[in-house]
Amino acid sequence: MTHKVLHWLKHVVLLILLLAAYLTNSFLLEVATATAHSAPSLAMRFIGLTLMSAAGLLALFIWYYRRQLQAENPRNFGKTPVRFNSILIVMTTFIALLAVQFLWMLLIVNHILPPPDNQAAVEAATNQLPFWNNAYDVFLAPIFEEFIFRGFFFNFFFVKNRPRDTWLGILMSGLVFGYMHTLSLSPTMLFYSALGCLMAWTYLHFKDIRYSIALHFLNNLWAIL
């Protein structure tokens, strides 16, 4: 029992460290955004640091993820061939994501739910440095977040390939994803959690992280259009 607890705590710490590495990288872009108008040359240096560290971090994530799968892979994660049927499933799941967001917008417009607390800050940051913030949100954030909240998460927890672990893992992955996007227990967290659950289902359905990354990419791209 003690061994299992220590094993679980070790995985929690590792996931936190991986998340901290990603947040540190995104913080560099926040600094660049904050100095974009007051010190443009400094902002460009931080953009360079963001891109270089993102490249290194991405290489680390890919290496560690593959190493995990080589050591233990009871769910047989790997590469699933891209076929018309798989594209159709991804697009159907994307429509489900849009439906969740449409429902959420209706609840906000009708003053049933409050708007996200961070919405104003996100819009202000985008206006300060639109190209780099949008590029990061669309291309880099989906990759890092899918590795953390889906790839590494399911390599650390709920590893057994059985229905109970699958559905509980989808729920917990979604809740962690939702909480990390709001840092609060709120209706907004449940909204993000629903999106996270759909992405987790996509990852487990295809057993290929490229599909959940593609879905996350489509979602973030739609958000800026």
Model feature map: region roles:
Residues 7-23, 89-96, 170-173:
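Alpha-helical transmembrane segments
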Residues 37-43, 72-141, 159:
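Juxtamembrane helix-loop-helix connectors linking adjacent transmembrane helices
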Residues 128-225:
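Transmembrane helix-loop-helix hairpins at the membrane interface
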Residues 8-68, 116-120:
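Alpha-helical transmembrane segments in multi-pass membrane proteins
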Residues 34-38, 65-73, 109-114, 182-186, ...:
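Transmembrane helix-loop junctions in multipass membrane proteins, especially transporters and channels
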